[in-house]
Amino acid sequence: MSAVNGLVPSTIFDRINSDMDVSEEMEEIREVLYEMIKTNFPMGVAATHLSEKYHEEFVSKGLGRELPEDWIQQVTAAEEFEAQTRGPITILFVRLSNTSSFKRPPINSVNVRVISTDREPTADELKKIKQRKENEPTEHAKTLSQQSVALKEGSTVSIVYADSPKRFFIRALADDDQYEKIGTTLAEIYAQETPPSALDSRVAIYEIVAGGAYALQDSNGTWFRVIAKQPPQSGQVMCHFVDVGVCEKFPVAAIRLLPPAVHPVMSIGSMAREVRMDVSEEESLRLNNKFVDLTFETKDDGIQVPINLTLSKFDSSDSESLPVVDLQSSDGLSITEFLKKPSGVVRLSTPTKTTSPITPASASTSSLTCLFDKPATIQPMTVAQMPMSAFPANAIFAAGPTDISLRQLSLDPMPDYMYAKLKDECALPDSQLESSPDFGGFYAAFIDDRWERVQCIRASKIDKQAYCVYLLDVGAFQYVRKEAMRRLNSTSPFKKMLMFKCKIGGIKPVAGGEVWSRESHEAVREFFEAACGEPVVVEPTQPGWSQWKQLNAPAVPTCEARLSCCGRDIGDWLIACGLALPINAPIPSPNSQSLLTFVPTPINIVGRNI
């Protein structure tokens, strides 16, 4: 596959069922937009930016009419256009004339496959899939409205999601194997499909039924059964995970039709039941932390896992409110009774990512127990802890092709809790620095409107009150004054640096050697900014993982890897921009035209800093 082809996205709109406007006015709009993209945005453009440019160049000058509300659907109904939705962003592309259509399936978190098919679906097949999309989601939702029979008084349960003692979700331990099996079975089903096809289980944005049941693949590649709570907005759907209790927004591209009702996946109702304890609203707010302490166990690495409890009471007699439950610990302790007992110290809880996450709502703290009299210790993750196959990650900092900081997506939402706890701890009087920081010691520093964990490197040679620090969770150096530094809580469960470093593999500078141009550094940074926080797929290449070697920087894991984001391989993109060469390509002569290549502006997406 050529570098340019590698940048072509998948087509997401189902053109067979769309009502295409073939009026003269709409055809004129298509022609204008086609020329705009072809001339100004040959590598694609965000639909919102294209709309703004169209209005600026044509509508405001009286040269064209306003775009209709469904203009994206109407434009992409034509074969000359292709579109890709990533989160809230729709990116439009055009096909050059006299070329065949190239389609790529949605990007998988683990691997990338390109599959094509020449068979046209029959009329009966199209009718059947249309009926499935219209009827099955509603019918499946009725099935999932029923609860698993394993959830009853006397059963062993765990809390899989919690807002407070007044609202949380429980799941029977007996259902855990079935829960894992459903995810595995769904993965096998969708792996056998050969998209893009009018007959696969993908669902277009206008086909989502509010209240309907679907399958959903999260950023880690795991499949779940969900209910679409609302119609899609900005390309995303609010989904309730019926077997976990979580409610989150996900892009339409991650959603599929569930198997037919006769399939074993649909033989069991929802496994997570929303319940409450017999406490008042006031007690619920006051007892949040204690509730988490009693029902979750914090491991040495800060990860919280739910404790197995016995469902000793289940009262669903009041149909207008949530069932009232009580839970017992292994030693027969009633959680409700213990919650209401007066207690001395309530420690700072740190809900972090588990297989069943607790939301930040449960992380409010009424009192903090922290120790600042001992030095804090923070260690990098080891090379052995890093994945060997492709995995999704968040981009944090990008200095250039050889210095990119990322964090495994599987660690979310742990960083959110870590930063929230760090903010609370730095507000305590005991965290104030009474003397100069120790070189090599770990501290907190207020940088870019946020408290960051840092390692103090040395004093500034210009400002005696400033210090050079290394941001442990960002991977960059910064200067900060002493008054903006705090001591770290030595009892904090967050003992690891979550960041790792990466170098883009398979490419080299166009001028040869190891030095990259200033333009290539800027392009890498702008690439990730344009992605608006979308996950990056990291595919490590040989020789695998090693330790980052930079003077005064921690030895965090690092690797050379292929990186892709929003369906684009950044290495291929740099090559297409004339900023890099394939690793095995010969170095062009100084007068070579390739060294004089015009560098196009990256996709103009309203982005944010990474």
UniProtKB/Swiss-Prot annotation:
GO biological process, one term: piRNA processing
GO CC term, one of those recorded: P granule
This protein's UniProt keywords: Repeat
Annotated Tudor domain residues: 149-260, 386-506
Stored SMART domains: TUDOR
Pfam families: TUDOR (PF00567)
PANTHER family on file: SERINE_THREONINE-PROTEIN KINASE 31-LIKE ISOFORM X1, TUDOR DOMAIN CONTAINING PROTEIN
Protein's UniProt name: Putative protein tag-250
Organism per entry: Caenorhabditis elegans
Taxonomy of the source species: Eukaryota, Metazoa, Ecdysozoa, Nematoda, Chromadorea
